[in-house]
Design a protein with these regions (language model features):
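Short, surface-exposed beta-strand/loop "edge" segments at domain boundaries and coil↔beta transitions
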Residues: 24-25, 29, 102-106, 128-134, ...
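Short N-terminal micro-motifs specific to bacterial/archaeal maturation
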Residues: 32, 80, 94, 136-139
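ABC transporter nucleotide-binding domain
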Residues: 42-56, 60-125
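Generic structural signal for individual residues within well-ordered alpha-helical segments
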Residues: 39, 90, 146-149
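ABC transporter nucleotide-binding domains
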Residues: 1-63, 67-70, 76
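C-terminal coupling/interaction segments
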Residues: 113-158
């Protein structure tokens, strides 16, 4: 009998869990799954890590990473180019949208990456609150993993 993509993913996960391993290495475990199957698989992973086990996930689906991972690593061309706790990333990091004039006059002490764009600069900061408090005219967005990955990959490290 033919299994759906979701059923195959669940079957693969059950097979992996049946070995009693304390570490699972999963490559794109939710790729190609519909929302329901993906959420079910993520729930299985969450249950697994509550038993003092670990999972290393390689994924391009950033929403899955935000909801399940403790640490986020970005690997580009075989090199770790970014690492931080996912909670820190979501709570403290942010994206600054700066005109050329704003960029020239802003304190860059907390800027980690910059990306030149049509209106000026996108900047990744690891201290969003610093810019909210000290630069009220600057657009400061709470970041998401997608925006971080984009600027880390395409931008320049400061």
């Amino acid at each position: 009998k033919e299994f759906s993509t979701g059923m195959r993913a669940r079957l693969n996960m059950i097979a992996a869990l049946s070995h009693g391993a304390r570490l699972l290495i999963l490559d794109e475990p939710t790729s190609g799954l519909d929302v329901i199957a993906r959420n079910e698989l993520l729930d299985i992973i969450r249950e697994y890590v509550q038993d003092d086990c670990s999972v290393l996930i390689s994924s391009h689906i950033s929403g899955d990473l935000e909801g399940i991972c403790d640490d986020l690593y970005m690997i580009h061309d075989g090199e770790i180019v970014f690492h931080d706790d996912t909670d820190v990333l979501l709570d403290e990091y942010g994206m600054l949208k700066l005109t050329n004039e704003q960029y020239a006059g802003i304190d860059k002490i907390n800027i980690r990456y910059i990306l030149k764009c049509d209106y000026g600069y996108d900047c990744l900061t690891d201290n969003r609150q610093f810019y909210v408090d000290n630069y009220p005219d600057v657009v400061v967005e709470k970041g998401c993993i997608d925006s971080f990955l984009n600027i880390v990959e395409k931008g320049e490290r400061v």
